[in-house]
Amino acid sequence: MVPASPGGPAHPLRADSTGLRETRHRMDDSGVRVFDLEFLTLTPDFDARHYRWLAEAGAELGARRISCCGDDPEPLRAADTFAALCELAGEYHLGVDIEFMRWRQTATLKDALDLVQRAGKSNGGILLDALHLIRAGGTPAQLAAVPRRFLASAQLCDAPAHLPADGDFVSESRTNRLVPGDGELPLREIVAALSKDTALALEVPMSAYAPHLAPIERAKRAIDAADKLLLSWRE
């Protein structure tokens, strides 16, 4: 809905628009549901009121959460901004999840937890990305210590245990992830630390890792790998 970075892809559907109605028709026909709306960046000058359109459209799509990241160096202001976004989202029965990333100001699991707790909003939570957790120096044990009510959603992928040789964490995150089971991330321990109510998703952009695959084949490979991995853990 909103580009994750300047110039990035986005599909800004507006409430009661032709595009949104067509999307709803296709959702109804296919059985696909929308969980979260991406992606807001909480900068020092962020104004939640400018994104009422996003919450309105999300409500029409039946979404449950809005995802954001934090890029404000002032923790108190960042928490106030997050709280304001939670209040606006709450008017439409939506929650808000903060996703921490090593290269952002809200960089670690602790940063995200501090922000959510400081904001003090019941519909505020954390979006846990397995890659970001490990690349930011986090561990499954640290994740297990987080009150589970804050762990609203999680994104799974895999990666080598070692850091990117060129130090480019952004490119790795956006173009070079592995499907679950093809890397060395402690996915089993990460999933075990989540709440049974945590919504699981796959985030496996692999345009650098598998540029020859069509998007539908990338999606199928990721889903098949995740199914295989999750089923194996139940045995």
Where on the chain are the PLM-derived regions?
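Glycine-rich, proline-tolerant flexible connector loops at the mouths of alpha/beta enzymes
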Residues: 1-22
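The substrate-binding groove and active-site-proximal loops of carbohydrate-active enzymes
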Residues: 9-10, 38-40, 69, 177-181
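Hydrophobic residues within beta-strands of alpha/beta enzymes
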Residues: 1, 35-37, 66-68, 154, ...
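Histidine-acidic metal/acid-base catalytic patches
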Residues: 28, 59-62, 109-128, 134-235
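A short acidic, helix-capping loop that chelates divalent metal ions and anchors anionic groups
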Residues: 4-10, 43, 208-213
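Residue-level preference for long, well-ordered alpha-helices that form the structural scaffold
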Residues: 12, 16-19, 47, 74, ...
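Flexible loop residues that form catalytic
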Residues: 1-5, 42, 71, 159, ...
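Active-site acidic/histidine proton-transfer and metal-coordination neighborhood
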Residues: 20, 26-126, 135, 233
